[in-house]
């Protein structure tokens, strides 16, 4: 039980190097791993044949039920090669019937249900960590007991390599170049690498991220199936499940189509009646290369191995954020996500047609995400670039296509393999602290006492609307304002200034002194992950007033759901070309509510020093206050006026709407429970009706049988009544009273019956014993048959002795 299923215990026929020969030895396998590698889905379930298997729906049985679920056992032969490739799929395999013209001898991978031949191959089974959580029993919360990925270091196993792959790895380590040959004769990583390099040399535009997003897997492959490696290494599609509709021609959301994807499996896109006009994703390729999800999360291969076998065709981000230090390099020195680099394509357990688990993405860095969305290579661009047309000059400008900003916010799931809360919180706080260092101080001349103020304003500029950090800062600023002692009014004070401000203090200096006092008390370490989670939850709720900024509606569809991720990612993902933006002063200019004159003065003067927000526009911390991120400790001086009343009314309406939605959800749950109960009762009633119908049919058959029997008895009775029978003779005096014809009739009947009686008597005498007249006659030794066996033992034959016969007859 300790040996792997592969028999590769002997060396290859051509003596390989020592390192290769050592690896070719059969590695020990854990008993559970050995069981799955050898027996999982290789035999048909005997209970399913008897219609007794309880693990059919949902299908969690250890054995296969239908032929297209059958898995061939992967074996490494004595020559060091696998019995079928772990990477190249067979083009003749019928996924519906599970049949291949070459049968089990086919050297290519069969795309069985659940892709079990690839996932449970010696090359990939349990070689990567699962991205999903582990329950109390140690099983995967997503894939259950049969998860093909490891849940912990104790569950990991070393991959079994093909001899050609080992030779390619040794040649790569020795600095030798791999001899070019056919794709089928190369290892998985070497063949993919060679094919990608050839494609990039033929079409250099594949190195551009925007070109990949717009054209990857949108055109059919023109090469013969045997000459193309297929999968991720080829940017063209080979079947309907590999095809991707171009987002430039077709507008569809990032959510999977319910008619195509059932559970975790992607079915045939032809099952959707809408075809290419469907508004949802039909393949995994369409979902992972959707503009809302593409490059939104980090590549796990880059983080763990430092290389990715998919190269420019990877749907996940490869660029790490620049090192954060006091001496920041200029933005031009930071590489762009589209710049090609020396990438080593090593064999990986990544998916063949799509980059899936165990090459799962991890948490995206906030600064890297912002730089990616804005098209800049460094966070310094985010803070120092002025607003205007220059912000649109992005290397990812073509990633977002028209019509996507009208999608409903927060209505879709997140990308596969999204980050966990602890990772997001750590990265989020880390970038908050470092943005102040990265912020240049070249907006306008400042005194020596102001350098500390600018980074703190930058921190406020990058905080999302409704963030607990913003609320705490607003509370601190309000407290500082309230703690400032009133100053005597002067004659030179501006009409819009506070009456208590000193006349020789400029308005901007007054506001900056307040901000500096408030931010001195701010410690970013005091804010934990819980506060950030609340920030993300609050930022995902759309504002009921549907405020528009720059003419575009703040609506988007969030990426697909990721196990173990935050509840919402609307702050990180946006369908608009620009990154998420905070509410600008446009919201303050609504005709329903204007702030007081003194507050407008504060807002106007602070805007002159406006720090750049996430959208790159001049904005100040007062915009966060105006957008509804007030702290409970905010001074009433900032909440006075019709604008504050309007905000309070809108907030109340939002709370009421949320309460109504919760009530509707509860009502819907109750109605669903009642509907399920009614459905169950209806099913039970139907079963009872079926049983009653069967009983009724049986009773009807019994009734028909009884009626037939009664009918036969009646016919027999009628026949007996019509047949003339011997009648009992009346008494002698009565005979004289009868007519002569009646007497003749009685006489005739009696003669007939008498003849019948005589015949019966003669027949009985001829077969019965002459002595006892009960037993049947038997043949005596004298060959006479006149007595029975019992009587013949004690009497002599009456025929041989006539006197005896006469005596018997008398």
Swiss-Prot record:
Keyword terms of this UniProt record: Coiled coil, Cytoplasm, Metal-binding, Phosphoprotein, Repeat, Repressor, RNA-binding, Translation regulation, Zinc, Zinc-finger
Q: Where are the zinc fingers (C3H1-type)?
A: 84-113, 124-154, 215-241, 251-285, 293-321
Which residues does UniProt call coiled coil? 643-727
Which residues fall in a compositionally biased region of kind Basic residues?
241-253
Question: What does this gene product do?
Answer: Sequence-specific RNA-binding protein which plays an important role in the establishment and maintenance of the early morphology of cortical neurons during embryonic development. Acts as a translation repressor and controls a translationally regulated cell morphology program to ensure proper structuring of the nervous system. Translational control depends on recognition of its binding element within target mRNAs which consists of a mandatory UAG trimer upstream of a U/A-rich motif. Associated with polysomes.
> Which PANTHER family does the UniProt record give?
RING FINGER PROTEIN UNKEMPT HOMOLOG, UNKEMPT FAMILY MEMBER
Which protein are we looking at? RING finger protein unkempt homolog
């Amino acid at each position: 039980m300790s040996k792997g299923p592969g028999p590769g215990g002997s060396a290859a026929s051509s003596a390989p190097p020592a390192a290769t020969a050592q690896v070719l030895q059969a590695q020990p396998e854990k008993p559970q791993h050995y069981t799955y590698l050898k027996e999982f889905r290789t035999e048909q379930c005997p209970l399913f044949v008897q219609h007794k298997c309880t693990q059919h729906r949902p299908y969690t049985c250890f054995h296969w039920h239908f032929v297209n679920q059958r898995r061939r056992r992967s074996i490494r032969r004595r020559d060091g090669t696998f019995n079928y490739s772990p990477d190249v799929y067979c083009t003749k395999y019928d996924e519906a019937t599970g049949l291949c013209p070459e049968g089990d001898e086919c050297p290519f991978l069969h795309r069985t249900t659940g892709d079990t031949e690839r996932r449970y191959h010696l090359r990939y089974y349990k070689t990567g960590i699962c991205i999903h959580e582990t329950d109390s029993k140690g099983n995967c919360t997503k894939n259950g007991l049969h998860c093909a990925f490891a849940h912990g270091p104790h569950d990991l196993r070393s991959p079994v390599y093909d001899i050609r792959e080992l030779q390619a790895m040794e040649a790569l380590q020795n600095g030798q170049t791999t001899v070019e040959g056919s794709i089928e004769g190369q290892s998985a990583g070497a063949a993919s690498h060679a094919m990608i390099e050839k494609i990039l040399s033929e079409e250099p535009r594949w190195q551009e991220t925007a070109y990949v997003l717009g054209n990857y897997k949108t055109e059919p492959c023109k090469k013969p199936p045997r000459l193309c490696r297929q999968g991720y290494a080829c940017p063209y599609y080979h079947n309907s499940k590999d095809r991707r509709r171009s987002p430039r021609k077709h507008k569809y959301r990032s959510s999977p189509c319910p008619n195509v994807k059932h559970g975790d499996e992607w079915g045939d896109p032809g099952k959707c009646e809408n075809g290419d006009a469907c508004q949802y994703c039909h393949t995994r390729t369409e979902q992972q290369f959707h503009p809302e999800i593409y490059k939104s999360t980090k590549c796990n291969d880059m983080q763990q191995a430092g290389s990715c076998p998919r190269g420019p065709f990877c749907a996940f981000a490869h660029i790490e954020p620049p090192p954060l230090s006091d001496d920041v390099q200029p933005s031009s020195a930071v590489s762009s996500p589209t710049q090609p680099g020396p990438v080593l394509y090593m064999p990986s357990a990544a998916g063949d047609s799509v980059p899936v688990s165990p090459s799962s993405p991890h948490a995206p860095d906030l600064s890297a995400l912002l730089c990616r969305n804005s098209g800049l290579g460094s966070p310094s661009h985010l803070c120092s670039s002025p607003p205007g047309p220059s912000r649109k000059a992005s290397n990812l400008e073509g990633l977002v296509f028209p019509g996507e900003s009208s999608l409903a916010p927060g209505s879709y799931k997140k990308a596969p393999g999204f980050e966990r809360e602890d990772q997001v919180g750590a990265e989020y706080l880390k970038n908050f602290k470092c943005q102040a260092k990265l912020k240049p101080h070249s907006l306008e001349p400042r005194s020596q006492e102001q350098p500390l103020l600018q980074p703190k304003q930058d921190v406020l500029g990058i905080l999302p609307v409704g963030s607990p950090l913003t609320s705490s800062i607003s509370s601190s600023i309000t407290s500082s304002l309230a703690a400032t002692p009133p100053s005597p009014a002067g004659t030179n004070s501006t009409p819009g200034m506070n009456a208590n401000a000193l006349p020789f203090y400029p308005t901007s200096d007054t506001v900056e002194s307040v901000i500096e006092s408030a931010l001195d008390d701010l410690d970013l370490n005091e804010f934990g992950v819980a506060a950030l989670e609340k920030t993300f939850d609050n930022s995902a709720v759309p504002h009921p007033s549907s405020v528009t900024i720059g003419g575009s509606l703040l609506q988007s569809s969030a990426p697909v759901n990721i196990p173990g991720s935050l509840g919402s990612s609307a702050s990180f993902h946006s369908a608009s070309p620009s990154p998420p933006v905070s509410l600008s002063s446009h919201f303050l200019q609504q005709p329903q509510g204007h702030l007081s004159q003194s507050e407008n003065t504060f807002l106007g003067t602070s805007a002159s020093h406006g720090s750049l927000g996430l959208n790159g526009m001049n904005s100040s911390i007062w915009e966060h206050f105006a957008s509804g991120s007030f702290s409970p400790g905010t001074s009433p001086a900032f909440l006075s006026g019709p604008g504050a009343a309007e905000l309070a009314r809108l907030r109340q309406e939002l709370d009421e709407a949320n309460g109504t939605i919760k009530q509707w959800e509860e009502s819907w749950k109750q109605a669903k429970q009642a509907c399920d109960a009614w459905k169950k009762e209806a099913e039970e009633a139907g079963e009872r009706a079926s049983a009653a119908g069967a009983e009724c049919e049986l009773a009807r058959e019994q009734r028909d049988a009884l009626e037939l029997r009664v009918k036969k008895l009646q016919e027999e009775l009628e026949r007996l009544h019509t047949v003339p029978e011997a009648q009992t003779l009346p008494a002698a005096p009565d005979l004289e009273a009868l007519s002569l014809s009646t007497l003749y009739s009685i006489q005739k009947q009696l003669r007939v019956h008498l003849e019948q009686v005589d015949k019966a008597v003669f027949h009985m005498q001829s077969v019965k014993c002459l002595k006892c007249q009960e037993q049947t006659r038997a043949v005596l030794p004298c060959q006479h048959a006149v007595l029975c066996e019992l009587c013949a033992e004690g009497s002599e034959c009456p025929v041989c002795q006539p006197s005896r016969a006469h005596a018997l007859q008398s």
